[in-house]
Amino acid sequence: MKDNDIKRLLYTHLLCIFSIILSVFIPSLFLENFSILETHLTWLCICSGFVTAVNLVLYLVVKPNTSSKRSSLSHKVTGFLKCCIYFLMSCFSFHVIFVLYGAPLIELALETFLFAVILSTFTTVPCLCLLGPNLKAWLRVFSRNGVTSIWENSLQITTISSFVGAWLGALPIPLDWERPWQVWPISCTLGATFGYVAGLVISPLWIYWNRKQLTYKNN
C-alpha cells in the first residue's frame, strides 16, 4: 500500500466534504431566505445533486481501468441505466423501511422520500460509482475480509457511518425540547450528513494508521 494512494483517497474525500459545504452556502446567493432548517427540502435536493456530481467526477478519475469490452459505448449506456434503476430502488427501499419504522405514511411522504434520497446519495451512489451495478461486488465488499483496495475499505466506513448517523439523528425526535431541527426528518438527515462527513474524515486516517496491517487479495 503506497502513501500516495492514501493521499489521493484523502483529497478525494476532502472534495466530497467541500461539495456538502458548497450546498450550504452557494444556494443562499441565488435563493432568498435559504437555510438548512427553513428550506430543508430544497437543501436536501441541492446537497444530493452536489454530492452525486462530485462522486461521479471523482470516481471516473480514480476508478481502476476496466477492460476494453467494458469501455464500449453500449456497455456504458447500459451500465448508466442500471445505476439509475439501482438508485431509484434504493430510494424506494429506504422509504419503505422508514415507514415501517414509524415515519408518517402519507402526511410527510415527500419529506420521508427526500430523506431516503439523501441517504441513498451517501451510501448507494458511492457504491455505484466504485463497484457499478454489481450486487456480487457489493456483497463481497460488505462481507468480512472481502475488500480488495483502500477505496473499498473507505466505502465500508462511510456507508456504515452514514447509517449510524441517521439512526442517532432519530433519537432526539421524541424528546420535548421543541427545537426546529427535531421536526421529521431534519435531525435524521443532519445525522446522516454528519455521519457521512465523519466517515470521509475517519476512513483515510484509519487506513493510514493501520496501513501495515491491511492486506488485500489483489496485492
Curated annotation (Swiss-Prot):
GO biological process: GPI anchor biosynthetic process
GO cellular component: endoplasmic reticulum membrane
Organism: Homo sapiens (Human)
Keyword vocabulary terms for this entry: Disease variant, Endoplasmic reticulum, Epilepsy, GPI-anchor biosynthesis, Intellectual disability, Membrane, Transmembrane, Transmembrane helix
Pathway annotation from the record: Glycolipid biosynthesis; glycosylphosphatidylinositol-anchor biosynthesis
Family named by the database record: Belongs to the PIGF family.
Localization per Swiss-Prot or TrEMBL: Endoplasmic reticulum membrane
Lineage of producing organism: Eukaryota, Metazoa, Chordata, Craniata, Vertebrata
Disease: Onychodystrophy, osteodystrophy, impaired intellectual development, and seizures syndrome: An autosomal recessive disorder characterized by global developmental delay, impaired intellectual development, seizures or tonic posturing, dysmorphic facial features, and hypoplastic terminal phalanges and nails.
Entry GO MF terms: ethanolaminephosphotransferase activity
Membrane topology: Multi-pass membrane protein
Subcellular location, principal: endoplasmic reticulum
Domain of life: Eukaryota
InterPro entries membership: GPI_biosynthesis_protein_Pig-F (IPR009580)
Membrane-crossing residue ranges in chain numbering: 11-31, 42-62, 86-106, 113-133, 155-175, 189-209
Protein task: Stabilizing subunit of the ethanolamine phosphate transferase 3 and ethanolamine phosphate transferase 2 complexes that sequentially transfer an ethanolamine phosphate (EtNP) from a phosphatidylethanolamine (PE) to the 6-OH position of the third alpha-1,2-linked mannose and the second alpha-1,6-linked mannose of the alpha-D-Man-(1->2)-alpha-D-Man-(1->6)-2-PEtn-alpha-D-Man-(1->4)-alpha-D-GlcN-(1->6)-(1-radyl,2-acyl-sn-glycero-3-phospho)-2-acyl-inositol (also termed H6) intermediate to generate a 6-PEtn-alpha-D-Man-(1->2)-6-PEtn-alpha-D-Man-(1->6)-2-PEtn-alpha-D-Man-(1->4)-alpha-D-GlcN-(1->6)-(1-radyl,2-acyl-sn-glycero-3-phospho)-2-acyl-inositol (also termed H8).
Quaternary data: Part of the ethanolamine phosphate transferase 3 complex composed by PIGO and PIGF. Part of the ethanolamine phosphate transferase 2 complex with PIGG. PIGF is required to stabilize PIGG and PIGO.
Protein name, UniProt field: GPI ethanolamine phosphate transferase, stabilizing subunit
